[in-house]
């Protein structure tokens, strides 16, 4: 009963705080509780799993479950507090690696999406500068089966660990390619996840992405007319982050390039003999990007 599960969340938070303090003080009485939190971690992964068939869920039930998963993500952080974030991240990764190795016909996307969600939830706890697991995460995500829910979850995982890419720029090209392919299809959720990942990547790796600006602009010109408003804003902000890492003269020229496609859209609407409401809304959206 998920309603009962939620009642325990504060208990686990308080217990994790006390156990963490005791472990830091070298109290041997706290050691057995590590096993308890390892069991808790496994239970949470099971509860994070979407039902095999969620088509029978009402919209409210689906929203409630998503909200519940985010609360469960907070309890995962309690597990990190006791077991260590690196160890917890490795556990989630091993679940997916094991599933991929078996390649069973009975394997469902839900079996891999739940540990992916847990990786995303734990992102703020992991020291990406020293992690030995994060490189394995970035190697794994592009190898996931091409299911839209896994693609969506994988992009959001990448968006949580872009600080690692800043310390390992040799991986930047492959990661950038993976993120940009998230805009190729018609799935709005995947495009939104790709836009978020692009924003975080450009924010954390702005200096390394300066040589890629022409490539980024080519990509921007190819997608800006089809993106949803919020996604266009995220991608515009992403490229603006890169511009801030340029010398003043180069930044001025780059800003002109970035603004040009948006200004062209506004100009097209202004030239219409009788602009419709959607036309005016599109022009207003482009002006918001410019602001």
Regions found by a protein language model. Give the residues of each.
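Karyopherin-beta/Importin-beta family HEAT-repeat alpha-solenoid scaffold
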Residues: 1-291
């Amino acid at each position: 009963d998920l309603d009962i599960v939620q009642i325990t969340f504060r208990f686990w938070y308080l217990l994790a705080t006390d156990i963490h303090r005791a472990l830091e003080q070298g109290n041997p009485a706290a050691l057995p509780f590590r096993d308890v939190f390892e069991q808790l971690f496994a239970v949470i992964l099971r509860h994070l799993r979407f039902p095999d068939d969620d088509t029978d869920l009402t919209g409210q039930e689906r929203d409630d479950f998503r909200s519940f998963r985010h609360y469960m993500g907070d309890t995962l952080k309690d597990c990190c507090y006791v077991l260590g974030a690196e160890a917890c991240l490795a556990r989630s990764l091993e679940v997916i690696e094991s599933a991929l190795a078996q390649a069973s016909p009975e394997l469902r996307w839900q079996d891999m999406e739940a540990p992916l969600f847990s990786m995303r939830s734990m992102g703020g706890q992991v020291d990406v500068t020293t992690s030995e697991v994060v490189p394995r995460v970035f190697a794994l995500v592009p190898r996931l089966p091409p299911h839209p829910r896994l693609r969506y979850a994988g992009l959001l995982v990448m968006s949580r660990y872009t600080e690692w890419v800043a310390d390992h720029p040799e991986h930047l090209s492959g990661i950038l390619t993976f993120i940009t392919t998230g805009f190729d299809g018609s799935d709005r959720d995947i495009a939104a996840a790709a836009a978020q990942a692009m924003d975080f990547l450009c924010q954390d790796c702005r200096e390394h992405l300066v040589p890629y600006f022409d490539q980024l602009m080519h990509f921007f010109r190819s997608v800006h007319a089809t993106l949803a408003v919020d996604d266009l804003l995220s991608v515009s902000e992403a490229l603006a982050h890169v511009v801030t890492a340029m010398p003043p003269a180069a930044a001025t020229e780059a800003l002109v390039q970035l603004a040009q496609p948006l200004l062209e859209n506004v100009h097209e609407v202004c030239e219409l003999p009788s602009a419709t409401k959607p036309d005016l809304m599109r022009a207003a959206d482009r002006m918001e990007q410019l602001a």
